[in-house]
Amino acid sequence: MNRLYTPISTLAVLGLSAGLLTACGDSAPISLPTTPVPGTPAPTPIATPKVRFIAFGDAGRGNENQNAVGAAMAQLCKLKGCDFGIETGDNFYEVGVTSVTDTQWQTAFELPYKDLNIPIYPALGNHDNADTDVGEGANNAKGNFQVDYTTSPGSSGKWKMPARYHAFTAPLSAAATPLIEFFVLDSSPLAATLPNPAETEYNYLTYGPTQLQWFQTALMASKAKWTVAFSHHPYISNGEHGNAGNFDGAGMFPVGTTDGQPWKDLMDESACAMGLDFHIFGHDHDLEWLKPVASCNAKTEFILSGAGSDVRAFGDATLNPAYFQQDLAQGFFWFEVTATSFTGEMHVLKDLKLQVDAAGQPMPMFTRTVTK
């Protein structure tokens, strides 16, 4: 930063203080000019650190809908700026990928987001770990191909999944003081519709506590102004699947992961107990910004971004209190974050196009700002 030196008069240079310069008798001190010398550089304004990112999910179909959302996000990022994106799972329908050279890497990721020249941090979803079209989540080992693609020679370099669950801070520069810390969580082994008993590595009875301990430790150690977890499965949702602990009305099924209770337990003992700021997720194919609930510290806000391709109607639009929600339309969220504010915009596509005003500027369906 350039320092501004205000020049003083020649008298001051000679060592005479303005306070000592007086006329004869008891006259008042002589006032010296403080006008800067022409050509003196103005001080460089201090830039307010900020982070801008998009959130989308349930996208990986390689169809017209996904391509349209990808184009809309690229258009918005060109107009408003984006540092990176986060993807909330179900990155590849219906049964994930089978290798780092699977053709879906091109059809359902590289091509739809070819004009998004930013890193994208995905979470794993139930369809990423499935063997059947219902997305039962019985083959969690499949998700490891998505981890491996991060360093694959065939990758464009946009895909960032160094582990099934991990954390990163933003701004992405290692030298920057973090404004946000993101915790990418692996919810699928804790909410599988039909868990596979042979997958001992991903058994919820051991995988859940291990991930929980990591998350608690990382969240407690965070120095960031804002904390954000993102995952595929919700804690609460007004979409078709509903709230964790009763996914799809699954209370009738045997105790296990079907109802999402192990996932709810993890969130209760970490995000809810420790005051996480935001949870961003997918699984339901709509857009929601839900209010805090008493069961989760009455502080954490919940943002569902699962309209990245094919969409659905709400399951129960009144199940949880919402600031705003939209079903049956493709869309995504854009966020701008500073040390004191967290602003989110819900962008809903119309006729598979980004909605803009007469001047070509984006028109969000809903905007909310949270301050600290």
Place the predicted regions along the sequence by residue.
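Bacterial N-terminal signal peptides that target proteins for export
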Residues: 1-12
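C-terminal motif of bacterial Sec signal peptides marking the signal peptidase cleavage site
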Residues: 20-23
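Bacterial signal peptide processing site
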Residues: 25-27
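N-terminal active-site segment of His-dependent metallophosphoesterases
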Residues: 32-103
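Structured segments of extracytoplasmic/periplasmic soluble domains
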Residues: 56-62, 72-79, 108, 112-115, ...
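Active-site glycine-centered loops adjacent to acidic/histidine catalytic or metal-binding residues
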Residues: 58, 89-90, 125-126, 185, ...
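Extended active-site neighborhood of metal-dependent phosphoesterases/phosphodiesterases
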Residues: 93-227, 241-262, 266-267, 275-278, ...
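A short C-terminal boundary segment appended to hydrolase-like catalytic domains
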Residues: 322-372
